[in-house]
Amino acid sequence: MPKHGKKYTEMSKKIDKQARYDFNEALELSLASSYVKFDETVDIAVRLGVDPRHADQMVRGTVALPNGLGKEVKVLVFAKGEKEKEALDAGADFIADEETVAKIKDGWFGFDKAIATPDMMGTVGKLGRVLGPRGLMPNAKTGTVTFDVAKAVEELKAGKIDFRVEKAGIIHVPVGKVSFGPEKLVENVKAFINMIIALKPASSKGTYLKTITVSTTMGPGVKIDPMFTK
């Protein structure tokens, strides 16, 4: 177990670890536990009653957070011709030309998300070994392999996130910044939870939402009662 500092320990004492809070209470407690000087990211971790080893219990999707993430999202687009222009007009930061592709092969990752038109997947596929492990591989299921590059760029810039359940049945995503305040964070959290509920696999038996925990980058976790999602 990692050893936490004095301030973390002090803040942890203010949170009842056995309690389960509603959305507003949980976010207010989490924000009150922030003790660092930088604008921390607020994260949410949801443990689901699924076994992702089975394909029919995989939970994966995207959601547009109503208030974004509070940070600039750098977007790289694999496109050519008119689609390249559309991507740039929509706000894309980089176009993957030959020089950029070579930089990626050499270890450059100055972008947060990647989009590709279907006709460029031959080029993208050659970068699979470097993009895949970093979660940067364009994927049709998350809307990042598409000819509608303008829409894809705009959505990512606005705070659209993609997620998938991990081996332990947990989905972990950022939902904003401490500076957002409780109201905007609650809106983002609810949008994410509602999407998780909508994606419940038919084969999932028993309790689906097992635990929901919210925390700041450096702060302790605060549990949300799943009953408040109904």
Swiss-Prot record:
PROSITE patterns: RIBOSOMAL_L1. Transmembrane segments: none annotated. GO terms for molecular function: rRNA binding; structural constituent of ribosome; tRNA binding. It comes from the Bacteria. Binds directly to 23S rRNA. The L1 stalk is quite mobile in the ribosome, and is involved in E site tRNA release. Belongs to the universal ribosomal protein uL1 family. This is Large ribosomal subunit protein uL1. It comes from Desulforapulum autotrophicum (strain ATCC 43914 / DSM 3382 / VKM B-1955 / HRM2) (Desulfobacterium autotrophicum). The lineage of its organism: Bacteria, Pseudomonadati, Thermodesulfobacteriota, Desulfobacteria, Desulfobacterales.
